[in-house]
C-alpha cells in the first residue's frame, strides 16, 4: 500500500500560498512568473511566505525563462540567490541545469547543490528535456544532496508520461523521491495516483483553483 498522497502546489504569490494551505496542500513550491514555468521569486515574497505558512515550502532557483543552459553571469546570479535563501532559513530549493546538448550540466548542478547544503534540493523538470532520462537520472544519482526529482516523464503531462515515470520509480525510487507533475489537478489526482507508483504529486491546481 502506498503512503498517503502528498500534494505539492506551485504558487507565485502570498495570497495563493495562503489559499493553497487552506485547501489542504501538503507542501508548496514558491516561484515567480508561473507563465514562464516558474522563476526565482522576489525575496520579499519568500520572507512573507516562510513567515506566514505552516506547511513546508520549497523555493525555485531559476534566473530566467527559456532553456536551462546558463552563462557565467547567470550562474553567478543563481549562486547568490542560493546564498540568500540559505541565509533566510529556507529548507529546500528547486533548480536544474543542462548543457547545450541537453544533458545534465554536472559541474553546475554539483556547484549549486554543494552551495545549497544543508538545504535539500529538488531537480526540476529540466530533466524532461534530456534525451535519455534514465541515463541522465543515473548521473544525478551520483550527485550527493539531490533528494527529489520533479518530472512528467518527458511527456507534456503526467498522464501521458505515466509509464516513463513508473520506469524511473522502479529504477531510482530508492534513491530519489519522484514527484509526478504536468497538468495534475484535484480532478484527476485520484486517477493518476492509481496509475503512477509515487505518492508525491505537483500542480498549480492540485488542491483546486487558487484564484481568489
For each feature predicted by the language model, list its residue ranges.
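Glycine-rich phosphate-binding active-site loops on the catalytic face of alpha/beta enzymes
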Residues: 26-39, 84, 88-101, 144-159, ...
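Alpha-helix-loop-beta-strand connector modules within alpha/beta enzyme cores
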Residues: 38-65, 106-126, 162-185
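Histidine/lysine/aspartate-rich catalytic loop segments that bind and position anionic ligands
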Residues: 118-157
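Hydrophobic, well-structured mid-protein blocks that either form specific transmembrane helices
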Residues: 82-131
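Catalytic cores of alpha/beta
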Residues: 12-23, 59, 63, 69-84, ...
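Hydrophobic faces of well-ordered beta-strands that scaffold small-molecule active sites
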Residues: 5-11, 28-30, 57-61, 93-95, ...
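Alpha-helix N-cap and loop-to-helix initiation/capping positions
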Residues: 37-45, 70-80, 100-108, 132, ...
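N-terminal beta1-alpha1 ligand-phosphate binding loop
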Residues: 6-19, 23-38
